[in-house]
Amino acid sequence: MTEEIDFILDSTKESMEGSIAHLEKEFLNIRAGKASPAMLGSVFVDYYGSATPLSQVAKISVPDARTITLQPFEKNMLQVIEKAIMIANIGFNPMNNGDVIIISVPPLTEERRRELAKQAKTEAEDAKIGVRNVRKDSNSDIKKLEKEGTSEDACKIAEESVQKLTDSFIRKVDELLVVKEAEIMKV
């Protein structure tokens, strides 16, 4: 195969891996019953005028499966952090005891579990669409090479390779979804 085709295949694989990485990151934000620092990943605190991730203004720890504690690096940030958690609207009610913020993670109801499973399916479908869009772009690039003089056989083999990559990454998305759904639905 030509160097151009190798480049297309490498960038295809890299882009598809990016879709999987994004899906895994999104799955971390979908809580599955037990407390985790990742649950607060979407919380940003107003730190002297700039939106700063919560993890950069407080130590986040998980003493047990139902509790998250936040120890601010600066005491004057307690109220600001508490307010940011409320604004983030992630279903937590923080309690400020003057030194730390304690968040009790409520157990998930059956209805909420179904909502989260549905959200996971939506994220997985978005990842599949991303993978398919990469395939479409790669096949289009291969067609351009064919018009520019690359052999038809080489282009056909490249398209088959792109399809194999696509199938492999779609399978990976499905596997990740099955694991996440099981994690969400486990009581």
From Swiss-Prot:
SUPFAM superfamilies hit by this protein: Ribosome recycling factor, RRF
Q: Which domain of life is it from?
A: Bacteria
Q: Which UniProt keywords apply?
A: Cytoplasm, Protein biosynthesis
Pfam family of this protein, just one? RRF
Identify the main location.
cytoplasm
The processes (GO biological process) annotated in the record are: translational termination
Q: Which GO terms describe its molecular function?
A: ribosomal large subunit binding
Query: Where is the protein localized?
Result: Cytoplasm
GO terms under cellular component:
cytoplasm
Leader peptide range in chain numbering? none
Tell me the function of this protein.
Answer: Responsible for the release of ribosomes from messenger RNA at the termination of protein biosynthesis. May increase the efficiency of translation by recycling ribosomes from one round of translation to another.
Family, similarity comment? Belongs to the RRF family.
Question: What is the protein name stated in its UniProt record?
Answer: Ribosome-recycling factor
Q: Which organism is it from?
A: Flavobacterium psychrophilum (strain ATCC 49511 / DSM 21280 / CIP 103535 / JIP02/86)
